[in-house]
């Protein structure tokens, strides 16, 4: 055996079959091209192929079969194996693509197995509920795993997502003005869908009413704001799985950028802000506008409500605190370099002295009911602010503190690479999403970024939501939902 035969990784039989396949392909190719396009070279090419078969084919039977099939007098004979070589070549390419896909799927499954093993370890250490609320604290320390539990697809970009406070339902609002409700245990088709606006939905909020000493039945309210200048109020009818529109709120003269609904005693109010530079307070029961004030000189992009106070963030890069019943502006925060996308109050949590910003530092702040707030901006930062105490007087509306009316920035979180779109606070963690396609989890105690989800979406991440931890009517669950420009919502569940 020669040296080149030793290097060839084929047996004699395999080499003979390969040679026959090559010759059959050459024979087919010459029939298709040379005979029709280069007729003058026909005989010379045919003779060369026959000669080549004499060198390559070892068995005389194989040579005779090939010469017979190549005979010009036998035009009707077709060798079924003439295209065997190109077919095998194409099969190898398809097989390589399939192998790459299988390797990617295997990598994903291995990651899921690691996450599940981590969850099993956590469950093994999980303690049952005790009188001092041990399990509640464990729930608040939950950080979602790397991969979502389910993926929801809709027809256009997701602009806002909200979890039902009690049921495994997620509400999804889109850039085409559609509103969806999905069952998290059967999310292939929506429970309900509604064309709620003629233009994009910009914001959404939900509230499960808690009417006491009243004949009114409690139910879930869904409020949406839109670029069509309208605010729509819906009742979620659980028995029929549908949205029932209660009313529309009209009054803003430009895009309605954010909406918030809250309840105090048996009174339910809705707050909205707009590009017309105003903030409006609405009565939920009759739809009347109770108050309108202008806290900023430019587009008001975000609001949050705590009792009689509203915090607002604007295109003018500032955030302001306002006493909404009187319309008195109380204090202002400056420090962002670009427009503010989201603002939120940081609510106090009882019996959590170890969590920074979640307990009051003085009795005066405790009596007032708030001390800190957080803002997210297009300057890629998240800032936590201490709100100055206003001048509080009995039976009179609060007024600005003449010696201290400026927010004090106590912590700046840096890590996002583009506009920060939304934030949510649970326990000692702050979750944020941004146009850099990532979601981040921050530790409020240290200011460190604990976890980054970088491949949840292929476009901007516009919204996220977790259960609140400060409402006694809402039991926090280990769930998080995100919505993005790629028309997808990712849901994380334990």
From Swiss-Prot:
WD repeat copies, ranges: 153-192, 196-244, 251-292, 295-334, 347-395, 415-454, 457-492
Annotated Gene Ontology cellular component terms: cytoplasm; microtubule; microtubule associated complex; spindle pole
Domain LisH: 14-46
Keywords of the record: Cell cycle, Cell division, Coiled coil, Cytoplasm, Cytoskeleton, Microtubule, Mitosis, Repeat, Transport, WD repeat
UniProt key word Kinase: no
Gene3D superfamilies the UniProt entry points to: 1.20.960.30, YVTN repeat-like/Quinoprotein amine dehydrogenase (2.130.10.10)
GO biological process entries: cell division; establishment of mitotic spindle orientation; microtubule sliding
InterPro entries hit by this protein: Dynein_regulator_LIS1, G-protein_beta_WD-40_rep, LIS1_N, WD40/YVTN_repeat-like_dom_sf, WD40_repeat_CS, WD40_repeat_dom_sf, WD40_rpt
Molecular function in Gene Ontology: dynein complex binding
A Pfam family it matches: WD40
Localization in the cell: Cytoplasm, Cytoskeleton; Cytoplasm, Cytoskeleton, Spindle pole
Chief place of localization: cytoplasm
Coiled-coil parts of chain: 90-123
Keyword Repeat: yes
Function: Positively regulates the activity of the minus-end directed microtubule motor protein dynein. Plays a central role in positioning the mitotic spindle at the bud neck during cell division. Targets cytoplasmic dynein to microtubule plus ends, thereby promoting dynein-mediated microtubule sliding along the bud cortex and consequently the movement of the mitotic spindle to the bud neck.
Family membership: Belongs to the WD repeat LIS1/nudF family.
Free-text note on domains in this protein's UniProt record: Dimerization mediated by the LisH domain may be required to activate dynein.
Protein name: Nuclear distribution protein PAC1
The organism of origin for this protein: Saccharomyces cerevisiae (strain JAY291) (Baker's yeast)
């Amino acid at each position: 055996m020669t040296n080149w035969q030793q290097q060839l990784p084929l047996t004699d039989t395999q080499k003979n079959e390969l040679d026959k396949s090559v010759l059959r392909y050459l024979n087919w190719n010459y029939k298709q091209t040379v005979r029709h396009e280069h007729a003058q070279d026909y005989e010379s090419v045919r003779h060369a192929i026959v000669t080549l078969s004499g060198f390559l084919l070892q068995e005389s039977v194989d040579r005779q079969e090939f010469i017979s099939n190549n005979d010009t007098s036998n035009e009707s004979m077709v060798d079924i194996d003439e295209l065997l070589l190109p077919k095998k070549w194409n099969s190898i390419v398809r097989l390589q693509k399939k192998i790459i896909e299988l390797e990617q799927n295997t990598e994903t499954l291995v990651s899921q197995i690691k996450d599940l093993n981590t969850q099993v370890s956590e469950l093994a250490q999980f303690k049952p509920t005790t009188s001092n609320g041990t399990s509640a604290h464990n729930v608040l320390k939950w950080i979602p795993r790397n991969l979502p539990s389910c993926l929801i697809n809709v027809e256009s970009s997701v602009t806002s997502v909200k979890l039902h406070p009690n049921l495994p339902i997620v509400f999804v609002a889109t850039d085409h003005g559609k509103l969806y409700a999905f069952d998290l245990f059967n999310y292939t088709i929506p429970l309900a869908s509604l064309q709620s606006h003629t233009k994009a939905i910009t914001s959404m909020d939900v509230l499960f009413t808690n009417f006491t000493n009243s004949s009114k039945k409690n139910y879930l309210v869904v409020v949406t704001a839109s670029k069509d200048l309208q605010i729509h109020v819906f009742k979620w009818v659980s028995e029929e799985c549908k949205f029932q529109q209660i009313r529309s709120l009209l009054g803003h003269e430009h895009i309605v950028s954010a909406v918030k609904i809250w309840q105090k005693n048996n009174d339910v109010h809705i707050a909205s802000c707009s590009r017309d530079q105003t903030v409006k307070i609405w009565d939920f029961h009759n739809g009347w506008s109770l108050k309108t004030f202008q806290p900023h000189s430019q587009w008001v992009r975000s609001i949050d409500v705590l009792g009689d106070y509203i915090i607002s963030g604007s295109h003018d890069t500032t955030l302001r605190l306002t006493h909404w019943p009187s319309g008195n502006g109380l204090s202002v925060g400056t420090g962002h370099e670009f427009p503010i996308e989201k603002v939120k109050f940081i609510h106090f949590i009882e019996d959590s002295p170890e969590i920074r910003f979640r307990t009051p530092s003085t009795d005066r702040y405790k009596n007032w009911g708030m001390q800190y707030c957080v803002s997210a901006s297009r300057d890629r930062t998240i800032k936590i602010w201490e709100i100055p105490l206003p001048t509080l007087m009995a039976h009179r509306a609060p007024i600005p503190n003449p010696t201290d009316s400026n927010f004090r920035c106590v912590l700046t979180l840096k890590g996002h690479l583009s506009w920060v779109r939304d934030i949510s606070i649970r326990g000692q963690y702050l979750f944020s999403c941004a146009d850099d396609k990532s979601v981040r989890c921050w530790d409020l105690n240290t200011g460190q970024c604990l976890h980054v989800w970088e491949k949840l979406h292929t476009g901007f991440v516009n919204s996220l939501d977790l259960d609140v931890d400060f409402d006694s009517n809402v039991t926090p669950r280990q769930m998080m939902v995100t919505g993005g420009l790629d028309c997808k919502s990712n849901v994380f569940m334990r």
